[in-house]
C-alpha cells in the first residue's frame, strides 16, 4: 500500500498467462491462462463442480476448453480483441482473483518492447475510464527483467508463450532501434511437438489436447547442445526415451521429440518461419550496438520468460554465440577467443521475472507522484498523459 492506504497492483499480461499481484511481493498472487471461451453447445449446466456460463475466463475456460470455442485476446504480445481483453481484466480485478476496488488502487502494467503507441493509449484509456484506477504506469517488460536481476544495462532474451524478444537495455532505458522480435515462442513449440507426436502415430487433437502436450513439453523437452550427437542418440539408442502418462491413463513414449521441438527456436525453418534463430538474432543485435557497449552486453545476457526454462538452453546459446563471434568477428582466429567474455544469466525464477521486476519498481515508486499517471491528469489531458512516461505521443 502507498501512504494513502491505496493498494498498488502489478499486472503482467502475457499472451499465454496473466501474472498479477501486489507491489513488494516476491511472487504473483495469481497466475492463470489468458483465455476467454464460449460454449460451443449448451448441453449441460455443470461439468464436475464448474458451472458452464456463456462466457468462461481463465482457469475455468482452460479446464473446459474441449467444450468451448476459445480465444486468446492477445497475439504475439499485442492486444487483438479488446472486448475479450476487458473480460480478462474483469476476471483479474473481480471476486475470482484479486477482488479489489479499482478506484482505490494504482496499477503497474507491462508491455512488450516495440508495442504500437495505439495499443498503449487504449490500455491507459481502459484503465482510467472503465476501471477508474487512481494511478497507472506502463513499463517495458525487458527493463523490469533487468531490475529484478539488479541490473541497469544488459540484453534480455525474453521468450514467453506468444513472442520472443531480444531487447538491449542501457542505463535503464530500452533501445527500441536495436530490439528484435522472433515470432516463435512457447505456443509454437507446443504446436510443433503435437505435430511430431502425430508423426509418431499418437492421436492428438490440436485444441483439446493442447494443454496436455504443453505439460509434456514442460516436463520432458530440452535444448540439445550438439544437435548431430542428439540425433545420433535418438536413432541408435533408447537413452532419450521417456514415458509419460496422459490424463486418460494412456502411456506414451517420447524420444527424439524431446529436443526436436525446442530446436525450432534455433532453426525457425523447421516450423516454416523465415529468418534466423534466437542465437544468431542475439549475436546480430549485440553486434549492431555501439562498439563501446558490446562487451557490457555480452557479459550481461539475461534470460526471461517460460520458454527459456528448457534445460540446456543457456549452454547452447553460449556455444552458438562463441561460434558466431569466432567466425564473423575474429575471422577464425581461435587464439583471440579467450579474451571474449560472455555471461548468460539464467535466474531460477525467470518464468515470473517481469512480474518480480514490476513488483520491485512499483514498491520503490509507490509514493512518488511524478511517477504515476493520475486519473486527474488523464481527465485533463486524455492519452497525452503518456508523455509522463517519457513516451512521445503522436
Curated annotation (Swiss-Prot):
Cellular-component GO terms for this entry: Arp2/3 protein complex; cell projection; cytoplasm; nucleus; site of double-strand break
Predominant localisation class: cytoplasm
InterPro entries noted in UniProt: Actin, Actin/actin-like_CS, ATPase_NBD
Molecular function terms from GO: actin binding; ATP binding
GO BP field: Arp2/3 complex-mediated actin nucleation; positive regulation of double-strand break repair via homologous recombination; positive regulation of transcription by RNA polymerase II
Keywords: Actin-binding, ATP-binding, Cell projection, Cytoplasm, Cytoskeleton, Nucleotide-binding, Nucleus
Cellular location(s): Cytoplasm, Cytoskeleton; Cell projection; Nucleus
Binding annotation for ATP: 160-162, 214-218, 305-310
UniProt superkingdom: Eukaryota
SUPFAM superfamilies for the chain: Actin-like ATPase domain
One Pfam family recorded for the sequence: Actin
Protein role: ATP-binding component of the Arp2/3 complex, a multiprotein complex that mediates actin polymerization upon stimulation by nucleation-promoting factor (NPF). The Arp2/3 complex mediates the formation of branched actin networks in the cytoplasm, providing the force for cell motility. Seems to contact the pointed end of the daughter actin filament. In addition to its role in the cytoplasmic cytoskeleton, the Arp2/3 complex also promotes actin polymerization in the nucleus, thereby regulating gene transcription and repair of damaged DNA.
Family indicated by similarity: Belongs to the actin family. ARP2 subfamily.
Subunit note: Component of the Arp2/3 complex composed of actr2/arp2, actr3/arp3, arpc1b, arpc2, arpc3, arpc4 and arpc5.
Protein's name according to its UniProt entry: Actin-related protein 2
Species assigned in the record: Xenopus tropicalis (Western clawed frog)
Name of encoding gene: actr2
